[in-house]
Structures are given as structure tokens and as C-alpha cells.
């Protein structure tokens, strides 16, 4: 027989961002615990609110299965010595089955006698096993934890009650001074405590006390109520998934309402209004039918519709206070020219080991000028870059960004427009921060892309030069995100940048023009290049390339993200072609021969030493590929497909490791040329060939 098992942890209000992940953790740990203890069940359903983490184990077996089985042990000659005494092997076998040597008997199997025991064990009751739920609670982890009273135990928030019901039976799990029972708590202000007769009563019992325990149901209620409001007023609302998740986990009984503010505040940039509403107050901003931001907002209260007018008025008052501040900051900032703010940047620290923001911008200017030539950026766009790189951090010292730090770059764009800067310059100020997250939007302009790469590259060079290198577990300055941003922008723009090749030139340009420490030698430069190159793997994983393709292309000596991606595309595209396996096997054979011979000497191939026409054919084919300076990775692969029969014929017709040392080395030199070309695609030996 089976019963449903309910387990609820009642707490003080938890931060919204930990609720969903915490109840999932509780379910996952319980699932593992039940499986380890041999208790079968159908599924585990989760419930969660800011004040509770709950699981309902559906169709849980009432007890473990009984054990009735015969266990085979060591042969008799190992189980007993010549005098018939039990050996350690026999004793260990019996002990491992929870029995003694008195329980051992012997039976013959294929001419040999073996030790056996008959194990009969009654399964434990589920209620006994579920007493261990307290250990699951103790094992849970959180970003931040609290202690209460004089206990050493830590949890995300103090625990006030627990419910533990197996069907209608209480399983009295105990943690500190809290003993689980059948009483749960309703809404803090609208509901009362409620005694549950059965585990299955949980959801409906809480609804009667103004608690919607199912998070998905609460989310659905919020969405439906928002849509009703929107339809009534012909509004549009962008439902931010993160904000929706947050407000769902802030309330137990959601009621949606609309508020408004004075139209005069609409002169403030939209991003400021949205930040004030969404980030500070957890409101949804509202747009008219044409997508223009209007002076209304939508919010969610934790309660019913009683006294809703008072709630609306209170929320409007709080928002207007924020908007008054924003209006003041905006008006103050507009009083000054950009040069006023730029001049202050020499006194703003980028990092105390690196220098000022002004010095950082100066280095970015140098890096961008260098990269602009590499990327063949137009003269007009480089003129815009020169201007924006001299000013783009100015908004860091504005009043608005001082209050709304998340708007750095955004306010710079708006203030630059107000002072008459070119649109390319204004937009690039905002885009210098992009992408703002791992998979965030990329710059839309060439100038913005160049500025963003130069800014991120200087940041990485400067921090590495100062010895502040990320560890495997710690990256306080988000250098990995910066490196990944560089890779994504390069790939998006189609810009070729073999980082290991350009770093020495860049550092030479920066030398003597900055007080910041720079990488001191080739080893330090290579560390930076490898750090950036490692982020290419992240992009390939995001684009769902096969693991062996990723391993292969990253094992090459190729440094240019564009070429690495091209190699991955080519190998992935042709992976299932009929000729893929023979091509890869031929090239891998060459690699293995060179490794075995330990041949790395890039000597010139001497055609006078050729002894067979196959050598001439291979030489001609390889030379044709080498001489094509515009050869793409895709065309290189096609070239190898055509060359594959030639390579096979070469192996059939020649002894590579010839007795004549000159002939042997000449043939190895030929193979090395092939291998160097193949290396542009990757280490093909890492490919899984079917």
C-alpha cells in the first residue's frame, strides 16, 4: 500500500530569490534519501511561498520491501582453513550480510562448494525512515544563512513550525525545539492556523486561509489579473520573467492593482523611470498602444482586495518620492557640459593598483586605434571612436549614476545626446558596457563594438598585469565575463583577432604611456591569450556543438576565435558525411606518425629526394592549399577530401621511416606540412568517429 507524505518547513519571510531554488533543493535531497533507503514513490510535488518550503511525496510505499534472498560467498576452501575454522573471509562475508558464521551453509556449484547465507529481513516502516527528514534540513545549503536563539544550526531563515504527515499519521520529525505536527499557518494577516487531517488536505486548507501554496498557480493568478487590467485600459505591459518570478515569491495571496504618477516625470529618460519602478519597487511599467511609456504602473500586493485604495495611494507616494529625487538629479546634471564631468575622472579610481578611470580611458583609446586598423574600420567611424573613447566614462561622476549605478552608460548616452554629440558617439557610450550579462545583447554599432572590446581588453590586461587573476572559484572583477564579451562581439562582427599574436604589439604600444603594471613577459601575455581563448569553449557550448568537435578545435594552435568557430562549423557540418571518417583517419595517422617519430623540424621538402610519383602528387596538392592565401576552413576541408586518396596512395607506396635518413626526414617534412594545415581545423584525433 501507499500513502502521500507531506512535509512543510515554516519560516520567517525568506528572500524571494532563494524560494524556488530552496524548495527544489528540498525535493531533490528528499528524492535521493528515499531512493537510498529503498522507499518507492510516484513523484514529488513542491509548494513554496515566502514563509514555507513544502514537498508532497505522492504514493510513497508504507515500508521497505522485505528481503528474502540467498547470498553467495567465497568458496569453502577459502571460507574455512584445513582444520575447519572460519577464516576472516568467511567472517567478513557473514558480517556484511548482517549475520554470523553460524548462518553459513555450503552448496556445490559446478563442482565447487561455496558458502551461502539465507538473508531474511523485514523492511523498515516508512514512518521510521522519515524521521530522518531532520538530517535533510540540516544538509541544505543557502547563499546566506541565519542562526537564532543560542543554536549553532543555520538555515536561510528561522524555522517556526513543521508539518509531517504520512497520510493521516503524524511523523514527529524534530529539529531543535520544533517538533513537526499537523498544524500549519495561514496568511500572516488574513488567515489563521489550520489543523490538517490528512496530507492531501494541504493545498485546499491553505487556500481557505488565503495562502496559494502552489507557486505556478500564484504566477498564473498574477498574469491573469495583469491581463485583465491591461485589457480594461488598452495598455501594453512587457512581462519581465525575472520580475514575475520575484513577485510570485514575495506574496502568498496575490492581488494585482494599478497606480499612476504625474505626467511631468515623463521628461526623465525611460530607463530611469523603469529602474525606479521595476528594480526599486517591483512594479511592472506600462505602455500605451504605440509602445510609449506612460504614467501608470502595475504592482502586486500580498493580500486580498480590501482597502486597495489605501494600498494604491501608499505605493504611489513611495514611487513619487523616488521620482522627485530622479528629477532633481537629472536637472542638476544637465547644468554642466560633458567636459566638467570628464575632468573629474582623473580623481576617480579604476582600481587602486591600476590607476584612475581617466588613465583607463587613455589606454582604451590606444587599444581601439590599434584594433581599428586591424579590423579595417572606416575613417569616419574611427573619428567617432576617438571622440567617444575620450569621454565615455563621464557619467560615472553624475548625480544620476551616483544614485542609480545600474544606469551607467545609459545616462551617458542620454546626456551626450542632450549636448549635441554625434549619435554614433552617444550610442557607443551605452554599448561600451555590452553585453551586460553572459548572453546579453551585443552592441549594434561598429563604434560601440570596438569601444566595448577595447574597454574589456584593457581591463583584462590591467588586472592580469597587477596580479589579480581569477581563480577557478573566484572572479571578483568579472574578468571571465569581459573575456566572453570580447569573444561574442568578435564573432558577431566577424573580426579576426589572434590574441596571442597581437598582445605583444599592444603591450609595446602601452609601455611608457601608463602607470599601470603590464604583463612582464611572454608567459604572462600567453596567460591572457589563453584566458580569452578559453571563453570560446563557452560560446561553442552555447551553440550546441558536439563535445568531441569542441575538444578537437580547441586543441589546435589556432588563436583566432573566428577561425576556431569556422573549424567547429565545418567539422560539425561534415561529421556524418561518408568521406568524413576516411579523411579524419588519414590525417590522424599522419599526426600519430609524427608524434611517434618525435619530428617537429619544419625543414623544407627536397623534391630531388622523391622516389615515387605519389610523393610528387602529395607535394603538389599540399602546395596548392598552402599557396591559397584566402583559403577558408571550409575550403581547406574540401581540399583534404580531394587529397585523401592521394594521402592513402602515399602511405601504400612509401615506407615513411626509410632506412635512408635523408629520405625519411624528407617524408616526415612532407607529412608535417600536411599536419600543420590540418591543425588549422583542430586535433582531429579527438573526434569520435563512427
Curated annotation (Swiss-Prot):
One of its GO terms (molecular function) is glycine-tRNA ligase activity. GO terms for biological process: arginyl-tRNA aminoacylation; glycyl-tRNA aminoacylation. Transmembrane segments: none annotated. Its EC number is 6.1.1.14. It is found in: Cytoplasm. InterPro entries: DALR_anticod-bd, Gly-tRNA-synth_bsu, Gly-tRNA-synth_heterodimer. Its main location: cytoplasm. Keywords: Aminoacyl-tRNA synthetase, ATP-binding, Cytoplasm, Ligase, Nucleotide-binding, Protein biosynthesis. GO terms for cellular component: cytosol. It catalyses: tRNA(Gly) + glycine + ATP = glycyl-tRNA(Gly) + AMP + diphosphate. Belongs to the class-II aminoacyl-tRNA synthetase family. Tetramer of two alpha and two beta subunits. This is Glycine--tRNA ligase beta subunit. It comes from Lactobacillus gasseri (strain ATCC 33323 / DSM 20243 / BCRC 14619 / CIP 102991 / JCM 1131 / KCTC 3163 / NCIMB 11718 / NCTC 13722 / AM63).
Amino acid at each position: 500500500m501507499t500513502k502521500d507524505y507531506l512535509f512543510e518547513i515554516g519560516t520567517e519571510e525568506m528572500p524571494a530569490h532563494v524560494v524556488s531554488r530552496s524548495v527544489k533543493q528540498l525535493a531533490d535531497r528528499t528524492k535521493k534519501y528515499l531512493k537510498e533507503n529503498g522507499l518507492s514513490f510516484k513523484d514529488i510535488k513542491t509548494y513554496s511561498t515566502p514563509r514555507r518550503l513544502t514537498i508532497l511525496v505522492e504514493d510513497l510505499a508504507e515500508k521497505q520491501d522485505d528481503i528474502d534472498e540467498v547470498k553467495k560467498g567465497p568458496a569453502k576452501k577459502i571460507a574455512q582453513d584445513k582444520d575447519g575454522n572460519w577464516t576472516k573471509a568467511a567472517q567478513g562475508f557473514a558480517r556484511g550480510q548482517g549475520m554470523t558464521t553460524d548462518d553459513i551453509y555450503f552448496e556445490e556449484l559446478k563442482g565447487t562448494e561455496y558458502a551461502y547465507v539465507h538473508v531474511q529481513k523485514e523492511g523498515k516502516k516508512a514512518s521510521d525512515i522519515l524521521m530522518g527528514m531532520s538530517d535533510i534540513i540540516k544538509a541544505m545549503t543557502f547563499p546566506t544563512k541565519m542562526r537564532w536563539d543560542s543554536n549553532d544550526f543555520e538555515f536561510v531563515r528561522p524555522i517556526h513550525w513543521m508539518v509531517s504527515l504520512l497520510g493521516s499519521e503524524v511523523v514527529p520529525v524534530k529539529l531543535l525545539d520544533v517538533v513537526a505536527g499537523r498544524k500549519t499557518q495561514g496568511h500572516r494577516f488574513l488567515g489563521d492556523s489550520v489543523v490538517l487531517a490528512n496530507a492531501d488536505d494541504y493545498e485546499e486548507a491553505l487556500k481557505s486561509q488565503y495562502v496559494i501554496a502552489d507557486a505556478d498557480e500564484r504566477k498564473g493568478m498574477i498574469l491573469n489579473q495583469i491581463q485583465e487590467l491591461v485589457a480594461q485600459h488598452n495598455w501594453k505591459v512587457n512581462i519581465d520573467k525575472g520580475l514575475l518570478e520575484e513577485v510570485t515569491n514575495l506574496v502568498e495571496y496575490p492581488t494585482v492593482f494599478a497606480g499612476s504618477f504625474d505626467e511631468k516625470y515623463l521628461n526623465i529618460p525611460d530607463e530611469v523611470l523603469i529602474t525606479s519602478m521595476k528594480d526599486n519597487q517591483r512594479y511592472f511599467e506600462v505602455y500605451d498602444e504605440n509602445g510609449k511609456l506612460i504614467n501608470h504602473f502595475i504592482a502586486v500586493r500580498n493580500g486580498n482586495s480590501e482597502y486597495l485604495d489605501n494600498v494604491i495611494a501608499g505605493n504611489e507616494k513611495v514611487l513619487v518620492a523616488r521620482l522627485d529625487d530622479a528629477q532633481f538629479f537629472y536637472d542638476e546634471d544637465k547644468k554642466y557640459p560633458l567636459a566638467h564631468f570628464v575632468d573629474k575622472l582623473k580623481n576617480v579610481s579604476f582600481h587602486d593598483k591600476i590607476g584612475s578611470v581617466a588613465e583607463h580611458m587613455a589606454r582604451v583609446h590606444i587599444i581601439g586605434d590599434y584594433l581599428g586598423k586591424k579590423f579595417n574600420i572606416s575613417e569616419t567611424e574611427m573619428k567617432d571612436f576617438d571622440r567617444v573613447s575620450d569621454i565615455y566614462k563621464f557619467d560615472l561622476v553624475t548625480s544620476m549614476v551616483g544614485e542609480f549605478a545600474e544606469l551607467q552608460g545609459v545616462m551617458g548616452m542620454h546626456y551626450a545626446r542632450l549636448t549635441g554629440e554625434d549619435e554614433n558617439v552617444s550610442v557607443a557610450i551605452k554599448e561600451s558596457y555590452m553585453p551586460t550579462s553572459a548572453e546579453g545583447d551585443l552592441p549594434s554599432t561598429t563604434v560601440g563594438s570596438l569601444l566595448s572590446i577595447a574597454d574589456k581588453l584593457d581591463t583584462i590586461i590591467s588586472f592580469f598585469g597587477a596580479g589579480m587573476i581569477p581563480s577557478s572559484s573566484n572572479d571578483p572583477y568579472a574578468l571571465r565575463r569581459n573575456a566572453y564579451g570580447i569573444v561574442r562581439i568578435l564573432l558577431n562582427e566577424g573580426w579576426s583577432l589572434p590574441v596571442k599574436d597581437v598582445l605583444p604589439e599592444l603591450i609595446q604600444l602601452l609601455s611608457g604611456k601608463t602607470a599601470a603594471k603590464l604583463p612582464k613577459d611572454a608567459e604572462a601575455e600567453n596567460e591572457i591569450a589563453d584566458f580569452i581563448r578559453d571563453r570560446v569553449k563557452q560560446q561553442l557550448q552555447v551553440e550546441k556543438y558536439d563535445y568531441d568537435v569542441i575538444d578537437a578545435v580547441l586543441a589546435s594552435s589556432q588563436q583566432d576565435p573566428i577561425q576556431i568557430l569556422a573549424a567547429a562549423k565545418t567539422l560539425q557540418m561534415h561529421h556524418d558525411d561518408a568521406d568524413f571518417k576516411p579523411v579524419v583517419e588519414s590525417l590522424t595517422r599522419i599526426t600519430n606518425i609524427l608524434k611517434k617519430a618525435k619530428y617537429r623540424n619544419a625543414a623544407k621538402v627536397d623534391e630531388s629526394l622523391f622516389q615515387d610519383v605519389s610523393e610528387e602528387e602529395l607535394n603538389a596538392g599540399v602546395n596548392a592549399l598552402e599557396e591559397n592565401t584566402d583559403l577558408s576552413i571550409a575550403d581547406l576541408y574540401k581540399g583534404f577530401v580531394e587529397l585523401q586518396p592521394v594521402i592513402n596512395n602515399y602511405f601504400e607506396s612509401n615506407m615513411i621511416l626509410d632506412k635512408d635518413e635523408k629520405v625519411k626526414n624528407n617524408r616526415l617534412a612532407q607529412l608535417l606540412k600536411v599536419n600543420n594545415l590540418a591543425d588549422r581545423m583542430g586535433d582531429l584525433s579527438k573526434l569520435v568517429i563512427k
